[in-house]
């Protein structure tokens, strides 16, 4: 990883220590500050540059085709950075105070219909140990709305089949208990009884859904497995994302009248506004049904 200016490294260390940001967020900030540092003409020009200089930097990014969402993130990063510089007495003024974040276009998450989800869940062959594992994973994803990273990092100790719950360590190391339902419980038990020992052979693993090498599966590997089963189920790849079953979980709950705050708790969202996007998905679906079936639609 590229070594940055010691002041920038100090800033990133402070973020890690004081704000408990995720590894991916910290990495994004580091990459943004690498780009920013490369753009500066002189080393440590960030100690003297002005609001106008920052506008030129952001304008240069837009000219190169960066999206507004990317600009919004780097503005957020720069605001934190220059606030840090002021707090640590590296600067007296904050040139980001006048910056305006671009309006971020709301991206509706891609979701599947209930019929498509059933087709996807039915795609794995439960007679094959690997596909039985995948079947249990897909069922658990749809039953709980877990993030893929949360799913693949589950250990046996996180699961309580008798009580029908799974203990999840989410973003910011926040813990939540999520009910898993009868169908997912059944397939997890099937995997324990018939697939797991065959998959592991003589190896030992605490991972709930291990790879053939008894290790934790990677996000990329699981994403490839989802796409494989989607093809078998005849689902358009354009409708897919690694979190497709998480989105379906939330959308289908809201479609069936679930309280938004309950969905928020199940998903592990810290902010209700993050969950509210699924109400837009549900409304879009309702409008589509109305247009298709209402005589004056």
From Swiss-Prot:
The active site is at 147, 171, 243, 246, 269, 278 (o-(3'-phospho-dna)-tyrosine intermediate). It comes from Haemophilus ducreyi (strain 35000HP / ATCC 700724). Keywords: Cell cycle, Cell division, Chromosome partition, Cytoplasm, DNA integration, DNA recombination, DNA-binding. Its main location: cytoplasm. InterPro entries: CB, DNA_brk_join_enz, Integrase-like_cat_sf, Integrase_catalytic, Integrase_recombinase_N, Integrase_SAM-like_N, Recomb_XerD, Tyrosine_recombinase_XerC/XerD. It is found in: Cytoplasm. The gene is xerD. Belongs to the 'phage' integrase family. XerD subfamily. This is Tyrosine recombinase XerD.
């Amino acid at each position: 990883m590229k070594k940055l200016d010691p002041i920038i490294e100090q800033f990133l260390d402070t973020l890690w220590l004081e704000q408990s940001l995720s590894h991916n967020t910290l990495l994004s900030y580091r990459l943004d500050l690498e780009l920013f540092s490369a753009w500066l003409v002189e080393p440590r020009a960030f100690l003297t540059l002005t609001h106008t200089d920052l506008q030129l930097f952001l304008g240069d990014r837009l000219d190169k085709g960066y999206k507004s969402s990317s600009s919004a993130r780097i503005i957020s990063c720069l605001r934190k950075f220059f606030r840090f510089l002021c707090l640590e007495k590296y600067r007296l003024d904050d040139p980001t105070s006048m910056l305006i974040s671009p309006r971020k276009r709301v991206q509706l998450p891609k979701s599947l219909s209930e019929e498509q989800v059933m087709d996807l869940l039915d795609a794995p062959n439960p007679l094959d140990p690997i596909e039985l594992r995948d079947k249990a994973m897909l069922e658990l994803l749809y039953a709980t709305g877990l993030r893929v990273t949360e799913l693949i990092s589950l250990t046996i100790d996180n699961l309580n089949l008798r009580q029908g719950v799974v203990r999840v360590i989410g973003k910011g190391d926040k813990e939540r208990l999520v009910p898993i339902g009868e169908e997912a419980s059944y397939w997890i038990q099937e995997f324990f009884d018939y697939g797991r020992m065959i998959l592991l052979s003589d190896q030992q693993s605490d991972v709930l859904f291990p790879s053939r090498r008894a290790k934790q599966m990677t996000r990329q590997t699981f994403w490839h497995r989802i796409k494989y089963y989607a093809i078998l189920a005849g689902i358009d790849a354009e409708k897919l994302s690694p979190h497709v079953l998480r989105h379906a979980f939330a959308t289908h709950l809201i479609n069936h009248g679930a309280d938004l705050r309950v969905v928020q708790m199940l998903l592990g969202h810290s902010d209700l506004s993050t969950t509210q996007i699924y109400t837009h998905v549900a409304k879009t679906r309702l409008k589509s049904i109305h247009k298709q079936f209402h005589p004056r639609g």
